[in-house]
């Protein structure tokens, strides 16, 4: 029985459309010389923007592996950069966005996930980068010290198809 050439081509074409969506993770890089005192980031997944057109939000899921204990008092900052301008979008307490509790920390040698919800979506532009940083407040420093930081671009929203 001869196999039609149409079926394999159709399968290839369909897979080209769906495989990138199934992958979900986006490219990221560590910020400047700071980066990974607390461990490594393994992937970042950004959900599509939701909410009213004038105030859409996204959810950022950051997955990582802790090489040191990450204290419960750690702060998580989400910011965006457009050229030289940096704007703070949201600040979270670590235990509000992870599996730790206020008495415990994320222990060294464990994997963790940060779920950063209701982050303002500032729109798509090739120059805009989002940044997620873990910061530790100390008595000696006025501003919290960056212990882990990654930059990434939020992908352009996929076009919506509407049939009538």
UniProtKB/Swiss-Prot annotation:
Signal sequence extent: 1-24
Major localization listed first in the record, in broad terms: other
Source species, domain of life: Eukaryota
Result of knocking out the encoding gene: Semi-dwarf phenotype.
Regulation: induction: Induced by the diamond-back moth Plutella xylostella and the generalist herbivore Spodoptora littoralis. Induced by jasmonate (JA). Induced by wounding. Down-regulated by salicylic acid (SA). Down-regulated by ethylene.
Subcellular location(s) per record: Vacuole; Endoplasmic reticulum
One Gene Ontology CC term in the entry: endoplasmic reticulum
GO biological-process terms attached to the record: defense response
PTM note: Neddylated. Ubiquitinated.
UniProtKB keywords: Endoplasmic reticulum, Plant defense, Signal, Ubl conjugation, Vacuole
Misc: Transcriptionally regulated by NAI1, a transcription activator which mediates the formation of endoplasmic reticulum bodies (ER bodies). ER bodies are rod-shaped ER-derived structures produced by plants of the Brassicales order.
Subunit structure: Interacts with RUB1/NEDD8.
Free-text function comment from the UniProt entry: May be involved in herbivory-mediated responses. May play a role in herbivory-associated molecular pattern (HAMP) recognition. May function is jasmonate (JA) signaling in response to HAMP. May play a role in defense response against the pathogens Altenaria brassicicola and Pseudomonas syringae.
Name of protein: MD-2-related lipid-recognition protein 3
């Amino acid at each position: 029985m001869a196999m039609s050439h149409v079926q394999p081509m159709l399968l290839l074409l369909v897979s080209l459309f769906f495989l990138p969506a199934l992958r979900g993770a986006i490219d990221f890089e560590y910020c400047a010389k700071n980066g990974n005192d607390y461990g490594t980031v393994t992937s970042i997944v950004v959900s599509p923007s939701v909410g009213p057109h004038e105030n859409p939000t996204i959810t950022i899921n950051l997955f990582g592996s802790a090489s040191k204990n990450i204290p419960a008092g750690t702060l998580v900052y989400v910011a965006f950069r457009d050229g030289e301008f940096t704007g703070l979008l949201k600040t979270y307490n670590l235990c509000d966005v992870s599996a730790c509790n206020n008495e415990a920390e994320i222990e060294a040698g464990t994997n963790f996930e940060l779920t950063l919800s209701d982050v303002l979506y500032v729109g798509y532009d090739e120059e805009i980068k989002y940044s997620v940083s873990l910061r530790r407040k100390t008595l000696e420093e006025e501003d919290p010290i960056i212990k882990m930081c990654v930059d990434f671009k939020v992908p352009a929203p996929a076009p919506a198809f509407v049939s009538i």
